[in-house]
Design a protein with these regions (language model features):
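Intrinsic-disorder/low-complexity accessory segments
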Residues: 1-423
Length: 423
């Protein structure tokens, strides 16, 4: 599924096998078929979906059955007996890890995140994995018992008896920064896309189970931003005054984080002090303007009856697009080596200057579903998710909506990274 090519793979314990020869074979085909047949390109809804890309999972389609011993549940490594508890290790990835971190934050437990690979007495630590050190939490009366209870729903955590690493950095060093428990402000109301706001709210309430303060955008002038560490601006058109924008700038400069989605990026586009621009160079902008003028001249001879069909060339109602990841950046932790974004709008920005372009569409990218020909040509070299650092804070730009309908699990994890991992 990742390369769209034939390849060898190793079947390992706890891998999932879905048979196509079963009573629900048609449903299995629908959920795993990446290339959906479209009877007509006129569509009001997404035109591609499949479980491997939605979950960011490594998956293979087989032409023959395989005969291996199977089981109905996932097996977890048993907890070893330990004499000393130095720390707890929690692998990062998926809803259970996000809920575990949320639970720890809500109970005032200090948590660290690995920034590099390391090997700790049989535990392979990956970037983004969580470490809870006993030394960081002297306020907990019974450290081992408290963390064990809080992680009751997380089956794959491990107990670490020593902070010395076989390879990579020792625990507690600069390679394991403390994560700040975010204080989240979410704006709603006039101008904010109600569906996209609802998707963020659902994520906070159900997926992460983490508190967020919801305030009507008309009251933004009365909000004391310093009471929060993170502001989420869901897709929409925010009618901020110049004073509101200045206050937002100061919030970021002093260490705050703003997560901006969809059309909300307009607040930062072409603004002094930020590097969010549609085009990387004046030449690129000139070429785009010239093509638009040429197309407008040519369209004078177009007939009215084919107008809707012609407009399709520059639209996308929902397709899967391959993205290259900067795997070293916290925004990409747990996502693997590539990310497939579910793109539902034609909005695009060329790769940004002076910004961490964490996920971007490469040249010759793979795609699934319908994309208009004109738009498809423009997508190469455009950024999907980026982080701009300003002063002590940051702005996370989300051109695509990773929370679309709440079912794109890789997107849910990416948003979790923006909320919890990007300090």
């Amino acid at each position: 599924y990742t390369t769209a090519k034939d390849d060898d793979f190793l079947l390992e314990p706890n891998d999932l096998i879905v048979s196509a020869n079963q009573p629900k074979a048609v449903l299995a085909q629908v959920l795993f078929e990446p290339y959906h047949h479209l009877s007509d390109s006129l569509s009001y809804d997404i035109t591609a979906w499949d479980i491997p890309h939605a979950y960011g999972a490594s998956a293979y389609a087989l032409k023959r059955d395989i005969s291996v011993k199977t089981k109905k549940t996932v097996s977890y490594k048993g907890k070893i007996e330990y004499e000393n508890v130095y720390a707890f290790y929690i692998p990062w990835g998926g809803k259970s890890a996000v809920k575990a971190l949320s639970m720890l934050h809500r109970n005032k437990v200090r948590v660290r995140s690995a920034r590099n690979q390391a090997l700790l007495s049989g535990i392979k630590v990956q970037p983004g994995d969580l470490i809870v050190l006993k030394g960081d939490n002297p306020h907990l009366p019974d450290f081992a018992q408290t963390i064990t209870v809080l992680l009751d729903g997380k089956k794959d955590y491990e107990v670490i008896e020593s902070g010395y690493a076989v390879s990579g950095g020792d625990l507690g060093g600069e390679g394991y920064p403390l994560l700040k428990a975010p204080k989240v402000l979410l704006l709603a109301g006039d101008g904010v896309n109600s569906t996209d706001f609802g998707q963020v709210w659902y994520y906070m309430d159900d997926y992460a189970d983490y508190p967020a303060t919801v305030v009507d955008v008309k009251n933004v002038a009365g909000i004391y931003f310093d009471n929060y560490t993170t502001i989420v601006l869901a897709d929409g058109y925010y009618d901020f005054t110049d004073n509101d924008k200045t206050r937002l700038d100061n919030f970021v400069s002093k260490g705050g984080k703003v997560v901006v989605m969809g059309n909300a990026l307009d607040l930062f586009e072409d603004r002094k002090g930020y590097n969010l621009t549609r085009f990387a160079t004046d030449e690129s902008k000139g070429d785009s303007d010239k093509k638009a003028d040429d197309d407008a001249l040519a369209s004078r001879y177009d007939d009215y009856g084919s107008m809707i069909r012609r407009e399709l060339a520059g639209t996308i109602s929902g397709a899967i697009i391959e993205n290259t990841l900067d795997v070293t950046h916290p925004l990409s932790f747990g996502l693997g080596n590539s990310y497939y974004s579910l793109k539902t709008s034609g909005s695009s920005y060329q790769l940004l200057k002076g910004v961490a372009n964490v996920a971007y569409v490469p040249t010759g990218y793979k795609s699934f579903g319908f994309i208009g020909n004109n738009l498809k040509r423009k997508m190469s070299g455009t950024v999907t998710f980026a982080v701009e650092y300003k002063g002590s804070g940051s702005v996370v730009y989300m051109v695509d909506n990773p929370l679309f309908r709440g079912f794109w699990e890789a997107g849910n994890l990416l948003f979790s990274n923006a909320l919890f991992q990007v300090n």
